[in-house]
Every structure is written in structure tokens, then in C-alpha cells.
Design a protein with these regions (language model features):
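Helix-turn-helix
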Residues: 2, 17, 25-63, 67
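Short, leucine-enriched amphipathic alpha-helices that occur as contiguous helical runs
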Residues: 11, 15-23
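Amphipathic alpha-helical packing segments from all-alpha helical-bundle domains
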Residues: 121-144, 152-164
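Hydrophobic/aromatic-rich alpha-helical bundle segments in the mid-to-C-terminal region
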Residues: 144-206
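Amphipathic alpha-helical hairpins
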Residues: 42-45, 60, 71, 75-91, ...
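N-terminal intrinsically disordered/low-complexity leader segments
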Residues: 1-13, 204-214
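Short linear capping/connector segments at secondary-structure termini
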Residues: 112-119
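Hydrophobic alpha-helical connector segments
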Residues: 63, 77-112, 129
Length: 214
């Protein structure tokens, strides 16, 4: 191929610019209709290099989401540290809310992924794995190690809270995502009640939340 391409100095930087390009294209077309060559051209990266480093558009999109997940968790952690002593439940809510805030400018991309996942089981599975990894990190950051069978069930329970809240978030144009926050709080309370009845969450809870598991 003959084109004026700028090859970044490192593979990491190449991945970043390719991921940004794929993410931008995803706003306007389904992921399975985005060609890796089009991503490379938009990123001004050699097509062969893009194929060698990334391999697929799906890989680039998931890598971009992983970057955004890290950003949201890092910001949530900073806010939690500034807030002082708060309960595990409040920390989890803060972590989830930061995700919704971080992705708020990218609802078009999330909508495209949701639509594509319905007809592409491989994408749906990878998105679910990515979500559960994010939830697990949120729990660990909040003081819940999420180990063992009960830990796995807590991850899935909070993932259910997340998915239910996401339906509201997609349409939420309220100031400060107030509708999303309200739904998130309601769903977390409901999940906590179910979890305690099923012995998934710790029943030993104090008013200050230090023994909360959700």
C-alpha cells in the first residue's frame, strides 16, 4: 500500500491511536461493519502494522473500553479517598456512578455495541467478561475481596444492578445523571436485600457501613 502514514514510536501508542479511531467510527456504524483498514487510515497508521498489532476492530474497541474503565475507577478511587470514611456500599455506588459519568459522552458507541451483541454471541460474551472484570475491580477497590463462590455471586449481583441501571442511563439527560443515581441506589438496596436472604451478602451490617458487603 502506498500512502503517507505516520508510524508511532511504540506499540502502546499505536494501540491507543487505533483504539481511539475505532471508538470514533463505532459511534456511527455497527462494529462488524468497521474495517481494520479504515481504522488504520483514520489513525494514520500503516495498515499492515495495524493488522499485526490489533488484528481486529473488536479487540481495539474492547481495549479502548478497558482504558475507559481504568480511568473511571481511578477517578472514583480519588473521590473516595477525599471523602474520608464511607461504607463499602457507598464506595461501590461511587465506582458504578463514575462509569456512567465517564461513558456519558459515548452513549452512541454503547448503543451500537448493545445492538451488535444481540446477533454476535462472541461479542456479547466478551462484553460480559469485561463488565464482570470491571465489577470485580470495583468491589476490591471498595473493600470487598470478592473471593470464592460468594464473591462470584456478588460480582454477578452487582453486574445485574449495573445492567438494570444502564437502561435508565441511556436515556438520562437529567442534571448530574440524577435519574441514574436514583435507580442505582434503588437497585443496590434491592440487591442487598436479596443477597442477604440468599446468604450471598454478609448479614453483619453496622450503621457506619464498615461491615457492609454491598
Amino acid at each position: 500500500m502506498s500512502q503517507d502514514s505516520t508510524i508511532p514510536n511504540s506499540n502502546y501508542h499505536t494501540m491507543v491511536v487505533l483504539g481511539d479511531a475505532a471508538w470514533t467510527l463505532l459511534a456511527n456504524q455497527p462494529i462488524d461493519q468497521i474495517d481494520i483498514d479504515a481504522v488504520a487510515d483514520r489513525a494514520c497508521v500503516d495498515r499492515g502494522l495495524a493488522g499485526a498489532i490489533a488484528g481486529s476492530v473488536q479487540y481495539l474497541v474492547l481495549a479502548k473500553m478497558s482504558e475507559l474503565d481504568r480511568q473511571s475507577l481511578t477517578e472514583a478511587y480519588g473521590d473516595i479517598q477525599d471523602a474520608g470514611e464511607v461504607s463499602v456500599r457507598e464506595k461501590i455506588i461511587e465506582g458504578l456512578l463514575h462509569w456512567f459519568e465517564t461513558y456519558a459522552p459515548y452513549r452512541l458507541q454503547i448503543d451500537q455495541l448493545n445492538r451488535s451483541a444481540r446477533s454476535h454471541p462472541d461479542l456479547a460474551l466478551r462484553l460480559l467478561v469485561s463488565l464482570e472484570a470491571f465489577i470485580r475491580r470495583t468491589l476490591v477497590m471498595s473493600g470487598d475481596p470478592a473471593f470464592g463462590l460468594r464473591g462470584m455471586m456478588r460480582v454477578k449481583g452487582v453486574a445485574g444492578v449495573f445492567l438494570a441501571t444502564a437502561c435508565i442511563w441511556m436515556k438520562d439527560d437529567s442534571n448530574g445523571l440524577a435519574a441514574t443515581m436514583k435507580m442505582l441506589d434503588q437497585r443496590m438496596l434491592q440487591a442487598e436485600e436479596w443477597g442477604i436472604s440468599l446468604r450471598v451478602f454478609d448479614v453483619r451490617r453496622s450503621h457506619d457501613g464498615l461491615n457492609d458487603r454491598v
